[in-house]
C-alpha cells in the first residue's frame, strides 16, 4: 500500500536520484514512487526529446502507466532546449506535484540539472545563432585538447574547471565568452536563489561496479536494437534536422546514422554506440565525484532501503 509522505507532515521538498547511465535509476524511482505516492520527474537531458524513446531509455508506456511521470518526451527534436528551459519546466512540475499531494522524485544522469535545481542558475543572455555557428564551425577542425586550449586562452577561469573531453561544456563556455565578453564562471556566480534547498531534499547517487556497469550498458544497447532503436534513428534522419541539434548526439545515434548512410556495418555501429555510452558513463561518474561529493552513495541493491531510511526523519 502506498503511503503519502507529504500528507504525514514535513516531508522532504523532493527526492533527487542521480547516477550513471544504465545504473537502474528509473526502476528505483518508480519503486519509490509506488511506495510513497510520488511522481517521477526526468532529469536527463536526452530523455526530454520525444523522438528517441527507445534509444534514450525513456520509460516504456507500461512503466509510465505505473506511476505519474513528468518532463519526458515533451520537447521536439528540432528545438534548442537549455538547462534554463529545463529548470523552468521542472519548477512548474514541482508546483503541480505539490498541488496533487505527490512526492517529487527527480531522476536522471544530467548533473547540471541537479546543480541548477539545488544551486540556482545564472540568467546568461542568449547566445546569438551567428556566434553559435561561428564557434562551432571553428571547433569542427579542432580536437578536444586544442579546443580546450582555445578556451584557456579566452577564458582561463572556465577552462580550469572543465575537462578537455567535456566538449559540449567547453563549447558552451566559448560561446558565452565570445557573445558576452564575460566568463561563464563569472555569470554563474550571479545565480539566484535555487528552486530547492538541498538540505531539505533527500539526495542519492547510485554507484555501480565498473565491470558490472559495462556489462549493463552493452546488454541494454543490444536490447534497444531489438526494440526498434534503428528504426527510431531512421525516422529521425528522415527529418533532415540541422546537424547541431542536441538530439542527434544521443548515444548511439551518430553511429547508427552512419550505418544507415552505408558508411559502416551494423555490428560496427553497435560496438561504437556501446563504447560511446561507456565513455559517457565515465564522464558522469567524474562529475558526480567532483561536483556532487556531498551526496550519499548506495548500490542499486541497497538504494531503496537507503532512500526510505533518509526520508523517514524528514516525515516526522
UniProtKB/Swiss-Prot annotation:
Region ranges (Interaction with substrate tRNA): 44-47, 168-172
Pfam families referenced in this protein's UniProt entry, alphabetically: IPPT (PF01715)
UniProt keyword terms in alphabetical order: ATP-binding, Magnesium, Nucleotide-binding, Transferase, tRNA processing
Membrane-crossing segments per the record: none
Positions with a binding annotation for ATP: 19-26
Broadest EC class assigned to this enzyme: transferase
Protein name per UniProt: tRNA dimethylallyltransferase
Source species: Xanthobacter autotrophicus (strain ATCC BAA-1158 / Py2)
Lineage: Bacteria, Pseudomonadati, Pseudomonadota, Alphaproteobacteria, Hyphomicrobiales
Amino acid at each position: 500500500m502506498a503511503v503519502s509522505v507529504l500528507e504525514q507532515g514535513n516531508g522532504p521538498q523532493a527526492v533527487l536520484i542521480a547516477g550513471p547511465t544504465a545504473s537502474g535509476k528509473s526502476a528505483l524511482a518508480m519503486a519509490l514512487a509506488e511506495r510513497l505516492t510520488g511522481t517521477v520527474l526526468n532529469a536527463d537531458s536526452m530523455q526530454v526529446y520525444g523522438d528517441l524513446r527507445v534509444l534514450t531509455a525513456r520509460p516504456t508506456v507500461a512503466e509510465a502507466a505505473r506511476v505519474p511521470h513528468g518532463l519526458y518526451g515533451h520537447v521536439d527534436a528540432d528545438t534548442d532546449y537549455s538547462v534554463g528551459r529545463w529548470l523552468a519546466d521542472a519548477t512548474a512540475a514541482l508546483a503541480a506535484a505539490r498541488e496533487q499531494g505527490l512526492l517529487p522524485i527527480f531522476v536522471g544522469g544530467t548533473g547540471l540539472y541537479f546543480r541548477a535545481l539545488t544551486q540556482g542558475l545564472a540568467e546568461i543572455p542568449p547566445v546569438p545563432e551567428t556566434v553559435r555557428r561561428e564557434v562551432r564551425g571553428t571547433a569542427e577542425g579542432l580536437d578536444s585538447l586544442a579546443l580546450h586550449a582555445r578556451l584557456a586562452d579566452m577564458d582561463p577561469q572556465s577552462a580550469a574547471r572543465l575537462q578537455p573531453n567535456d566538449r559540449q561544456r567547453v563549447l558552451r563556455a566559448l560561446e558565452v565568452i565570445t557573445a558576452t565578453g564575460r566568463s561563464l564562471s563569472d555569470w554563474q556566480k550571479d545565480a539566484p536563489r535555487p528552486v530547492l534547498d538541498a538540505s531539505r531534499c533527500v539526495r542519492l547517487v547510485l554507484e555501480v561496479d565498473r565491470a558490472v556497469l559495462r556489462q549493463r550498458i552493452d546488454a541494454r544497447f543490444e536490447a534497444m536494437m531489438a526494440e526498434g532503436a534503428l528504426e527510431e534513428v531512421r525516422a529521425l534522419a528522415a527529418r533532415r534536422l540541422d546537424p547541431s541539434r542536441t538530439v542527434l548526439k544521443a548515444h548511439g545515434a551518430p553511429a547508427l546514422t552512419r550505418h544507415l548512410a552505408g558508411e559502416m556495418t551494423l555490428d560496427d555501429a553497435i560496438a561504437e554506440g556501446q563504447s560511446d555510452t561507456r565513455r559517457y558513463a565515465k564522464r558522469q561518474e567524474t562529475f558526480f565525484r567532483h561536483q556532487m561529493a556531498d551526496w550519499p552513495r548506495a548500490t542499486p541493491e541497497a538504494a531503496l532501503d537507503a532512500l526510505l531510511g533518509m526520508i523517514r526523519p524528514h516525515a516526522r
